[in-house]
Amino acid sequence: MITYFFLIVAILLEVAGTMLLPVTSSFSKPIPTIIMVLCYLGALFLLTVVVKTLPIAVVYATWSGLGVFSVAILGYFIFGQGLPWPVILGLFLIVSGVVLVNSFVEPKI
């Protein structure tokens, strides 16, 4: 169960780093840039821990799928980016796929 906790934290760090990309103003603002880099490094470090227990295909599908979903939702609320119905349908399919992929995985102990 700790493996999934690490995976969730890795996703949150990746999403935080991605949401900081526009704030860095093409890396011209040092503080947001440093925080963004630390978020990405933390996410990648945790992914290396998680793949010791879960198959990499499942880890990457979950990380990227939930990351895309989260960034799209946050982009809507924070940056006012649109979410037309085809995008909403696509996000629903991504989350459904993540749930399906994780339903049949057995962690290595």
Where are these regions (language model features)?
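Polytopic alpha-helical membrane proteins, predominantly small-molecule transporters/carriers
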Residues: 1-109
